[in-house]
């Protein structure tokens, strides 16, 4: 699959939804990795691609995606997916990081945005925007400390932004590519 969401750690991860080759049909398949092998688990409710993920294999979260561009949020409790409150801004190709009760959604598209939202386990709240609006970026970290980096602003960028609570986005650097 391509354009799927991922969450978890090296020895316990989920690969969620995306497009199936060769037809690029949307998939609601979810697979779990145990550090050695992959196995299929309960399907997600909404089949979309290019969404972001946060959390663990027992307390996970996926959000955003396309087509169509959506604000959809679903949480995972280790055995089933549940619809949650939507992002305030529908988008795909965004970065996500954190845990199920403190996650961040940053950037995205298809209209390139700097929008950043924080999830508290129940709802999304708009917080400080990225310094560099972009989509197709990556992110990692906890809800209180993380990074977003790379992506496209219309052309590729190596911009890296550090997230810290309570100060929000700070310490913008541009790494060499």
Where in this protein do the model-derived segments appear?
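Polar, enzyme-active/binding microenvironments
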Residues: 1-177
């Amino acid at each position: 699959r391509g354009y799927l969401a991922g969450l978890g750690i090296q020895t316990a991860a989920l690969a969620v939804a995306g497009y199936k080759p060769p037809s690029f049909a949307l998939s609601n398949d979810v697979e779990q990795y145990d550090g050695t092998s992959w196995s299929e688990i309960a399907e997600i409710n909404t089949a979309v691609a290019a969404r972001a993920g946060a959390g663990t294999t027992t307390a996970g979260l996926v959000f955003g995606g396309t087509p169509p561009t959506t604000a959809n949020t679903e949480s995972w409790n280790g055995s089933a997916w549940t619809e949650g409150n939507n992002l305030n801004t529908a988008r795909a190709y965004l970065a996500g990081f954190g845990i199920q009760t403190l996650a961040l959604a940053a950037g995205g598209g298809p209209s390139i945005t700097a929008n950043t939202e924080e999830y508290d386990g129940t709802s999304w709240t708009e917080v400080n925007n990225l310094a560099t609006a972009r989509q197709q970026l990556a992110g990692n970290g906890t809800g209180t400390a993380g990074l977003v980096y790379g992506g496209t602003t219309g052309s590729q960028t190596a911009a890296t932004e550090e997230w810290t609570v309570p100060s929000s986005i700070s310490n913008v650097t541009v790494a060499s590519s």
